[in-house]
Structures are given as C-alpha cells and as structure tokens.
C-alpha cells in the first residue's frame, strides 16, 4: 500500500521552491526482523478490505494516526494488540467513527500524507495495547539519526504481506541526497515536511502494506510511512515519511480537541 514514486512532476524551479518553503501554508519491512510478540503495543493493523492493509499508531484511546493515502472507510477494521495478521486472543477489533484526512494532502506531490481516524469505541489499554504519545515539538530530524519502523507489509518485493509484525532499523538521509540525480531527482521533491530514511547501500526499507506505520527516531514519534520507489529496499529510492512538523502537530491536536 505504500505509494511508489509517480511520474514527472512540476518544473524544476517549482520543485526547488517547494523544497525551500517554510512550514506555513496549506510499505512492507525489508531487511528487518520479526519483533517480540506484542512488544510494539502502539501499533494498529488496518484492514481496509479483504486484501488491502495499512498500519497506524494509537495516539489516544480512540484515535489512530495513519497515512492519508490509506483509503479508510466505514467498513475498515482497526486491530490493536496484534502480532499476527490472523486472529489472536490479545487483539481488539475496532471500527471507524470518522476519518480526517489532512486537508492539504496532495496526491501528486505527496505533501501532507496524514490521516486521523476516530474510532467508535475507546481501546482498552493493557500490556498489549498502549498509546504512542505525540512529540511535544516538531523538531527536524538530523541526517544520520537512527530510526525504526514496523509493519505487516511485504518483506520482499514479490512476497505476500508478513504474517507477523516486523521491524527494521533505518537511518535518516539528507534531503539534498534524496533529491539528487542518483535518487529521486526531484520526482517527486523530498521537501521539508518529509523525512527520507533507509540505507544508502539499500536493503533496508518499509514496503507495500506498511503505509501509515509510525517512524520512531531516538524513541520519539517523528513521521508516518508515506511512499517509496518502484522496488522496496532499492538504494536509489529510500523510504519517505511524512514529518510531524509543528504545523502537522497543531492540526492533529485541533482535530482531536474539536471532535470531543
């Protein structure tokens, strides 16, 4: 479900402008390992249809943060306390009350790939289900920072989704590198509201089915899995994550406060 990079975008001048503008204005796990069961209790498995999954993070008892390109509907199921994609006694299955895609989400540029989902019922917090708190500030993540991302997506480009939760350690890559001709080449532009992360040698990445998974850097929630290249784990196209900037955090808090 993690998006692959799209066709040629706007002009280079426009792309450079997008990269430099300030905050204002409106995948599968490759190269990772299966986690200890229920050791990531904040993870939410999103079953959007019989054969489509995404992931998300439980940020309040009845709120999940995921990606805007995950097509959440009234019939979508949010499974908390999951290690396996199959039924487990620890799982809590909740349904959607209302979805709030980020209003400035752009399918073409991939800017603002965030979505808040309010659940019909509150989750029961226990050893298998826990809240992942939002960061206090939207501090940018420096290149070289170690991060981790988990999900139930593919662990190989031709594989089916993983039956169990997997996680991979990745490193933040400078946006200038991700935008150069050896990588995304500004198609699309990796802007200030995105985090580029993976391994410059390739082989470590999120993948299809990991969309919406939380990116944790130094143990802090910093991003949401958004898109990547045609092939997961390809060194030319590291994974790209929506950065939880102050602008995004303010929107999240406003939506949750206004929907009480």
Swiss-Prot record:
| Cleavable signal peptide | 1-26
Instruction: Please tell me whether the keyword Secreted is annotated for this protein.
Output: yes
Q: Which residues form the Peptidase S1 domain?
A: 29-257
User: Which Pfam families does the UniProt entry name for this protein?
Assistant: Trypsin
Q: Which residues form the propeptide?
A: 27-28
Residue pairs linked by disulfide bridges in the UniProt entry: 54-70, 147-217, 178-196, 207-232
- What name does the UniProt record give this protein? Granzyme A
Annotated organism of origin: Mus musculus
The upper taxonomy is: Eukaryota, Metazoa, Chordata, Craniata, Vertebrata
Please state the gene responsible for encoding this protein: Gzma
